[in-house]
A protein has these predicted regions:
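Short glycine-/polar-rich loops that comprise or flank the Walker A/P-loop
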Residues: 58, 85-87, 120
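Glycine-rich phosphate/nucleotide-binding loop
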Residues: 63, 84-87, 95-100
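A cross-family phosphate/adenosyl-ligand binding-site feature
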Residues: 1-56, 95-129, 133-134, 138-160
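Short, glycine-rich nucleotide/cofactor-binding loops
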Residues: 60-70
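Thr-Gly-centered strand-to-loop micro-motif
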Residues: 43, 62-64, 92
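Arginine/glycine-rich "motif VI" loop of SF2 helicases in the C-terminal RecA-like domain
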Residues: 79-87, 113-115
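A glycine- and small-aliphatic-rich helix-loop capping segment at beta-alpha/alpha-beta transitions
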Residues: 13-15, 75-83
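Short glycine/serine/threonine-rich phosphate/pyrophosphate-binding segments
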Residues: 2-7, 68-75
Length: 160
């Protein structure tokens, strides 16, 4: 209902679009969720909320936000990197809001803590129109074989 997500929901609703709200029980209080959602899914907690959003989503746009937004961004990047999801991730860098984070990603790659191919797991947009174009034009990054092999090995070990 509030903030940028609320603004997005109101905009979609005003144009006759469908909105799905996903909210943990603890936050499902009067005045918090957007009251005109086409569908409201109440989850047990934040972990279940993220899993539900990941399952329902075909792409992700990170708007300017706080620590919760950063945590969600890191999770979808990690899930993409490990092959658990295959979805576009667009960082909406309105007014340079995420410049420092993007510089940190570059620093991680230069220091060897992040493979340079992982920098292709997301794209950056400066306008809403560009964000939509990036979602539509999504191409999955080619990740190093060692990452793919590690995931396959872990899945085989977990299944056995």
């Amino acid at each position: 209902r509030t903030g940028l997500m609320g603004a997005c929901a109101r905009g979609v609703h005003s144009k006759g679009g469908r909105t799905v709200g996903v909210i943990p029980e603890k936050l499902n209080q009067p005045g918090i969720p957007f009251e005109h959602c086409s569908e409201m899914i109440v989850t047990k907690d934040m972990h279940e909320r993220k899993a539900t959003m990941e399952r329902l989503s075909s792409g992700f746009v990170t708007l300017p936000g706080g620590v919760g937004t950063l945590e969600e961004l890191m999770e979808v990047l990690t899930l993409n990197q490990l092959g658990y999801i295959d979805a576009p991730v667009v960082i909406f860098n309105q007014g340079g809001f995420y410049d420092n984070l993007l510089a940190q990603f570059d620093a991680l790659a230069k220091a060897g803590f992040m493979h340079t191919e992982c920098l292709k797991l997301f794209s950056v947009a400066a306008t809403p129109e560009e964000a939509i174009e990036k979602l539509i034009g999504f191409r999955k990054a080619k990740l190093p074989d060692k990452i793919k092999e590690a995931v396959k090995g872990h899945e085989a070990h977990s299944a056995g």
